[in-house]
Amino acid sequence: MKLGIQLYTVRDFLSQNMEDTISSLAKMGYQTVEHFGGFSCDADRLAEALSANNMSCVSWHAPLHYLENDLFFGTMAYFKRVGLKYCVFTVGPDIILDNEKRADLIKRMDAVQKALAPYGIKTGYHNHWWEFDQDALPFNDINKNTSLLMEFDTGNAMKNNWTLEKAAALYPGRQEILHIKPYSFEKEFNCDMGEDSVDWAAVKKVAREQNAQYLIFEHEDAPTAMQRAEKNIAMMKKLLL
């Protein structure tokens, strides 16, 4: 399993100096990154920074509309340049918790999945905690009505008392790429791996059973992001590899 980081974690540093941030993450031991949002960074510049540090951009949290209509081919050219393997969707509660809007979202994601497949890019869905509201109806609805990979976020799910073990038992074979986020019932997201409430031994077991390929660390605390990134990659190696 390769260790990566969601660049949202280091967003403040990334906006100040992308090249230095990528270099620092590589020195910590990260092998790949997951990007997010729009495509304000020049694709050549990003690809060159990653190549210079023997890193890759394995996945992207991309706004769905960038993969539709007139924006599709420009987005695909960008993805090809940076060598993307996974395109992952993440959606707010205003859509996820509305039955009609969620049904429309599922249709759109399914269409984009089919459009990306010929390019060799797999699609997935990244959960927050609101997918587990309403007795987990949104989470189950998405997984029952699509074949998207499940980029399961351990911390977000734990906030709503769900675990990777439970999710994988219901929907096996979808855990190629996982989000490794600590969460504590006492401190919420203000914690690190090994000081939190996530059962990392269970996560490791499921990751191996489901043949996970990428473990992507994410943290919410932007001001201490680089310290968190360094501390937690050491914990990922200790607890998950």
Q: How should each PLM-predicted stretch be described?
A:
Residues 3-7, 33-35, 57-62, 87-89, ...:
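Hydrophobic faces of well-ordered beta-strands that scaffold small-molecule active sites
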Residues 11-16, 34-45, 63-71, 94-100, ...:
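Acidic-and-aromatic substrate-binding clefts and catalytic sites of carbohydrate-active enzymes
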